Amino acid sequence: MERLDGKDSYIKKYCPVVDRVDVGEATARGWLSPYREYKVLIEVDDLSKYLELNREFYDHFSFFNHDFTLAMACASKWQKRVELAKIMCPDYANKPDEFKAINKQILIHAMGFNRALQGRKQFIYNHPKKIELTDLILKHRQDKKCITFSKTIKVAEKIGYGKVLSSKETKKKGRMTLEEFKEAKVGVLNTSKMLDEGADIPGLSVAVILGFDSSPTTKTQRIGRVIRKAENKVAEVFTFVIKGTVEEEWFRKSTSGKDFITIDSSNLLDVLEGREFTPKKNKETKMIFRF
């Protein structure tokens, strides 16, 4: 894993990777506790808001020929916009007005692209239905030790159970919050990104993932928080996915190769109360997802 300080180079030099063991193999060998992941497919009443943002997103994205790196660069760097404008107007030295108009057009599309991109993310990450279902899960698992993963601290603070561990706290208070939770037998700790990796918390058996992206590494690290080996433990992971959004594609990419059970919000209560239910077929909404 790369580090910002570059010290991963020492690991590569003196202790290179000689073998890899994935979660499935480690579980089969008994090194980790077994777990069930539930993909909770959520249908929301206000999906039209997302679809409008999505339409706007692709309108602007197409201007950049669906080149995500180019679109993002033009949104943040004026030099990149000038560079693109010169490509679109090769005779820019003799056509200054045309060059200026093209540069302005690039800026409009770049800002619109970024605005729609952030709008889609906000819709997905902050949807109140996720808070509602999280509280339902935690209400039914008050005899367990649970952790939630939100994309933002703001969402984590809205959850009705447990404490929040965030970068807003002082380091001392954060350590105290974490140590108290480690010592507890049951309870809830709500986090954003602080415990994605490197945290060893005994007794965890339930994870609720409200916000994620397409990274398989982050997904594996979060699951890893609740599958540390313990006798007679079967961990539960609930991952929320809003139907009809790019979150379906993020889930597919982040969960590739892993087993999961698809349910909807109507099945969730059956799962929580131990009743029989019929899993949904693992079919994605038929949409073209680029980003």
Across the structure, where does each feature detected by a protein language model lie?
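Conserved helicase ATPase core of P-loop NTP-dependent helicases/translocases
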Residues: 145-150, 154-199, 218-220
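Post-DEXD/H (motif II) to motif III coupling segment of the RecA-like Helicase ATP-binding lobe
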Residues: 1-37
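Inter-lobe connector of SF1/SF2 helicase motors
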Residues: 32-110
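Conserved segment of the helicase C-terminal RecA-like domain
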Residues: 225-255
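Conserved interdomain hinge at the start of the Helicase C-terminal
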Residues: 49-65, 112-158
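Long, largely alpha-helical accessory region at the distal end of helicase-like NTP-driven motors
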Residues: 76, 84-97, 263-291
